[in-house]
Amino acid sequence: MADPSAAVPRPQSDALDDGEARTPPLRPGGYDPAQYAGCVVRSAEAAGVSPLLVMTVLHNEAYKPHHPLLERLWQWWKPGASFGVANMHRVTFEQVRRRYGLSQRWHDLRDDPAFAIHAAALHLKDLDQNLPERHVRRLSRDELLALGYNAGERNMLAFARGVPPGPMARSYLRRFRAHRSRAATALASSGGHRDAAEG
C-alpha cells in the first residue's frame, strides 16, 4: 500500500517564487476566510477535494476568534476545544497526522492558518474516501462531508443511510447552505476558480 503522505504534499503557503502571496497573518477581530482563498485552493487541490467545500467549511467554522492568543485563552478556559481556523479537535488531528505523516503538532494549528487549512482538506479527503457513492438524495455529497467534518464520520455514514440529522447537525447544515454562495464568491474573487461556479 502506498504511503498516503507521499501522494499529498503540503502546499507551500509562504513560497513567493511562483507568484503566490503569503498566507495573511491572523489578527484579533479581523478573521475572514476569504483572505485564505489561495491557500484553500492549493490545499484542496493537493488533497483532491473541492475548494468550494473547504471554503464553505471554513466559513461555517468562523464563529469564534481565531487569533493564536485568543485560542490559547479559549483552550485554558475550555480544555479539549478545537484549534485553528478550521476548528479541528485533537483526536481528529492526530488521525490525520498519523495517516499522512505530518511533522507538525496539534498546537501548531492555532498559529499557522495554512497548516490548519491543509489538515482540514486532508480530513475532508478521508471522509470522502469513506463515504459510499450511493446515499440519500436529500443531502448532497458536499453536505454529507461537511456534516462528517462537524459531527464525525460515524454520524456522516448514518445520515448517508437516511438517519435524520439531529438539531445541532441541522443547524450546521443550514449554516453550510447559507455560506455556500459567500464561499463561492470568495473563491471567484481570488482568481475565478472553477468550483466557485458550481455552488
Residue ranges of predicted features:
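Boundary at the C-terminal end of the N-terminal hydrophobic targeting segment
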Residues: 2-7
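Catalytic glycan-binding domains that act on GlcNAc-containing polysaccharides
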Residues: 8-199
